[in-house]
Amino acid sequence: MSLFDLKLKDVHTKLHEKEISVSDLVDEAYKRIEQVDGQVEAFLALNEEKARAYAKELDAALDRSEARGLLFGIPIGVKDNIVTKNLRTTCSSRILGNFDPIYDATVVHKLREAQAVTIGKLNMDEFAMGSSTENSAFQKTKNPWNLEYVPGGSSGGSAAAVAAGEVPFTLGSDTGGSIRQPAAYCGVVGLKPTYGRVSRYGLVAFASSLDQIGPITRNVEDNAYLLQAISGHDPMDSTSANLDVPDYLSALTGDIKGLKIAVPKEYLGEGVKEEVKQSVLDALKVLEGLGATWEEVSLPHSKYALATYYLLASSEASANLARFDGVRYGFRSDNADNLLDMYKQTRAEGFGDEVKRRIMLGTFALSSGYYDAYYKKAQQVRTLIKQDFEKVFEQYDVIIGPTTPTPAFKIGEKTDDPLTMYANDILTIPVNLAGVPAISVPCGFDNGLPLGLQIIGKHFDEGSVYRVAHAFEQATDYHTKRPTL
């Protein structure tokens, strides 16, 4: 049994009872990475020398009884769009292939303060644009459950690393489902917090009004510990909410008697595979058995979410990615004759096809003559989608449905059809547009591939999301299943 199969509090106990050391945990991470990452390809860069040195420091602190907090000594992986001081951060893009940040993102700083150990940086779709991690400029991450299948995206490396037992925790980012979808495909737990709950300072921006950093773990309890550690107001992020962070662990009571669940008919409609629907209905039976009730509801504007998202996210991306021009940092083309040519060549050679596609789509949507017809209208529809959620939450505690319409698909199956690829996020995108929190927890299998249950909560009510997710998890054994690598 791996140390990473244990819950965080059990690892914490073993550390303090001197049954294991921090160096043992770090050794376990790098040993497992050496064993399986040649197949899975989750990590882009390793922090081995510094991590081992830091582990020795923490072991000395443990001997002096100076260990603080439950994350003390725990190995963690970080998605490669979250900046890490002096540890290469590329966003899986050639244009940032040589970028070494000079500061830590706020979430990385918080984990350092909690004395967690950064093991390395994780692969992703380039600039978080994708649903399969096939858009990385460097490598294609595989699904640990079946190496011929994708792990999801854009946080595919983050989910695959946890599923493969390389690290117990990772950080991902979620703009339209990029934590929840790979968590579902890889059979792990992934939470997108409420927009503003976690600081975005140091997250390389894709779509600033949608991006949110969140935790990926093997179980709900550990997920709550990690969110507790990274949440809170940050003066460096103007969109960070100045609200107290509740004690998420106190929500994990297992008691959901009287809880009212809404199930949107749109989330079990056309395009959702029959096995996926059945897994959700089976999960609802489990929750009914625990004392909750559910009713079918409608989120009528969900059908417009995909188009709305791709207009808004691409528009924001076209502005955010303008900063990558070859002047200040990252890749610079050698084939230019003048400054303007250098801008063009750098971006043409540095960005991948999907990133270029979205920049062009966003630039078009923002252009004179099209702004009102596309961007402005999309913002209006976003408001309607948010109001749909608010209306349902007036009567219900949580919304439940599948995380994805299908299980993971084969590598290469959808790369030639961007619209089919985009449709993988049809059930997760509305949550980002509304800014509410949502989690994916394992709820079944289809031909050996994991399925995810999505639990959506009210603004800043991650506690209720965790309460339901934990109750379901404790009543089932899906979270205990491991891929054989």
From Swiss-Prot:
Gene name of the encoded protein: gatA
Query: Keywords of this protein's UniProt record, alphabetized?
Result: ATP-binding, Ligase, Nucleotide-binding, Protein biosynthesis
Family under the similarity heading: Belongs to the amidase family. GatA subfamily.
What pairs make up the disulfide bonds? none
One biological process term in Gene Ontology: translation
In its keyword annotation, does this UniProt entry include Transmembrane helix?
no
Q: Could you tell me which InterPro entries the record lists for this protein?
A: Amidase, Amidase_CS, Amidase_dom, AS_sf, GatA
Molecular function (GO) terms for this protein are: ATP binding; glutaminyl-tRNA synthase (glutamine-hydrolyzing) activity
Judged by the first EC level, this protein's enzyme class is ligase
Q: Which PANTHER family does the protein's record reference?
A: GLUTAMYL-TRNA(GLN) AMIDOTRANSFERASE SUBUNIT A, TRANSAMIDASE
Please give the SUPFAM superfamilies that the UniProt record associates with this protein: Amidase signature (AS) enzymes
State the reactions this protein catalyses: L-glutamyl-tRNA(Gln) + L-glutamine + ATP + H2O = L-glutaminyl-tRNA(Gln) + L-glutamate + ADP + phosphate + H(+)
Give the E.C. number(s).
6.3.5.7
Q: Which organism is it from?
A: Halalkalibacterium halodurans (strain ATCC BAA-125 / DSM 18197 / FERM 7344 / JCM 9153 / C-125) (Bacillus halodurans)
Instruction: Please identify the protein, giving its name as recorded.
Output: Glutamyl-tRNA(Gln) amidotransferase subunit A
- What does the subunit section of this Swiss-Prot or TrEMBL entry state? Heterotrimer of A, B and C subunits.
The active site annotation covers K79 (charge relay system), S154 (charge relay system), S178 (acyl-ester intermediate)
Q: In UniProt terms, what function does this protein have?
A: Allows the formation of correctly charged Gln-tRNA(Gln) through the transamidation of misacylated Glu-tRNA(Gln) in organisms which lack glutaminyl-tRNA synthetase. The reaction takes place in the presence of glutamine and ATP through an activated gamma-phospho-Glu-tRNA(Gln).
One GO cellular component, as annotated: glutamyl-tRNA(Gln) amidotransferase complex
